[in-house]
Structure formats: structure tokens, C-alpha cells
Amino acid sequence: MSVRHSGIGMTSPRTRVRMVERLREQGVRDEVVLAAMGSIPRHLFVEEALASRAYEDVALPINYGQTISSPWIVGRMSELLRNGGNNSLRKVLEIGTGCGYQTAVLAKIANEVYSIERIGPLLTRTRIRLRELGIRNIYLKHADGMRGLLEAGPFDGIMMTAVIPEIPETLLEQLAMGGRMVFPKGNRQQYLCVIDHTTEGFVETILDEVMFVPILPGTINR
């Protein structure tokens, strides 16, 4: 089974360059993140019928009621996780693998990436896609992301790619001292937030207004 498709026209390397230039204009400043996003063929992470729109600044459907986040969201969340390079990101946990694009970006800016996806068939396709791209520092697991991945923690960074009303205590316990969590929080009204694990405890900062699909418990096998 292969999930590759061709990259021509609006999926050319020049299109990635223009995407990165647009991200700079939109305020993404971290050159490590921009280089990572410029090196990854985003069009390979969407259905072929949508490949020509892959570099537009929009979220796109990826089946199973899920979406691939817009380039700006991916850049913004990745930049926040790196925290200006102050977070070393030796080990990162991603909750919500989805199509794997954000996962691939994380693999470029972190030493090890552990990613959890609740939808089994979606994870199978993503696993193949990442393998075909030669990305090896990613560990994927089919599981309920609400529980995190205690056996692999603690993590220098945790990223959640679906909105949640409140962060469960079990996830906070998996954030290393000095680490940072980036996630969308809310219900109808949603905000991008960060939680820093400091010597004084967990410090939450509310940032941009956003819109994400909700996180759901349990797993889907077919």
C-alpha cells in the first residue's frame, strides 16, 4: 500500500517557498520551524484531489471527520513549542497524529517524537506516508490520547492538535520540568494556550483565538 501522489504545478518546491514567505509575513519568526516546513512536501499529506490547495492557508479535510491544520497554525504551534529555542525538545509528545504533517514538522525540530492517534485506519495511512518520506525519529501509537504516554515520559514538549476544555492532570504530570505544552482550549470559543512547567508550578498563558475539531475519548479500529 502506498499513499504517494505526484507533485506538480501548485505542489512544486517553489510553492513551499512561497508558503514560508507568507508565514514570515504572518508573524512566524523561528527560522528552524520555517526551514522544517519548507522542507516537507505538505501536498503528500492530503488527498490527491486537494493537493493543489495544500499550501493555501486553510485547514483541509483528511477523512474520518478530521482536518490538516492550516500552515499558519502548524508554524505558530511549532514556534510556541520551541519557545524561541529555549526549549531543547529532546522528547516531544503529540496528541492527535492525524495525517502526520504536524508530526513530520515536529520530527525536524525535536530529537524524538511520540505521537498518539485514536483512529486506527488513519494512523495506518500516516505510518506508511512517514516511512515513505524516510522520517525515522517518530514513534506512533494507536491509543486514547487523553491518557498521554506515561511509559515514554516525561516530555520536554507536549502538543495537542484538537481542542479540549481543560487539560487532564495525567497529561500535566507527563510534562518535564522546564517543558511546555501547546494546545487549543475551549468549546465554541477557542484559544491557543501554552502551559509552562516552572519551579513555581504550571503557568498557563492564553494567546490567539483559533478553531479546532474537538478531542474525543477512546479509540476507533475500523
Swiss-Prot record:
A Pfam family that this protein carries is PCMT
Catalytic residues as annotated in Swiss-Prot or TrEMBL: 69
In the record, what terms sit under GO molecular function? Answer: protein-L-isoaspartate (D-aspartate) O-methyltransferase activity
Primary localization class, coarse: cytoplasm
GO CC annotations, alphabetized: cytoplasm
State the compartments where it is located: Cytoplasm
InterPro entries linked: PCMT, SAM-dependent_MTases_sf
Q: Name one GO biological process term.
A: methylation
UniProtKB keywords: Cytoplasm, Methyltransferase, S-adenosyl-L-methionine, Transferase
Which reaction(s) does its UniProt entry say it catalyses?
Answer: [protein]-L-isoaspartate + S-adenosyl-L-methionine = [protein]-L-isoaspartate alpha-methyl ester + S-adenosyl-L-homocysteine
EC number of this enzyme: 2.1.1.77
Q: What does this protein do?
A: Catalyzes the methyl esterification of L-isoaspartyl residues in peptides and proteins that result from spontaneous decomposition of normal L-aspartyl and L-asparaginyl residues. It plays a role in the repair and/or degradation of damaged proteins.
Give the family from UniProt.
Belongs to the methyltransferase superfamily. L-isoaspartyl/D-aspartyl protein methyltransferase family.
PANTHER family, A to Z: PROTEIN-L-ISOASPARTATE O-METHYLTRANSFERASE, PROTEIN-L-ISOASPARTATE(D-ASPARTATE) O-METHYLTRANSFERASE
Q: Name it.
A: Protein-L-isoaspartate O-methyltransferase
Q: Which organism is it from?
A: Nitrosomonas eutropha (strain DSM 101675 / C91 / Nm57)
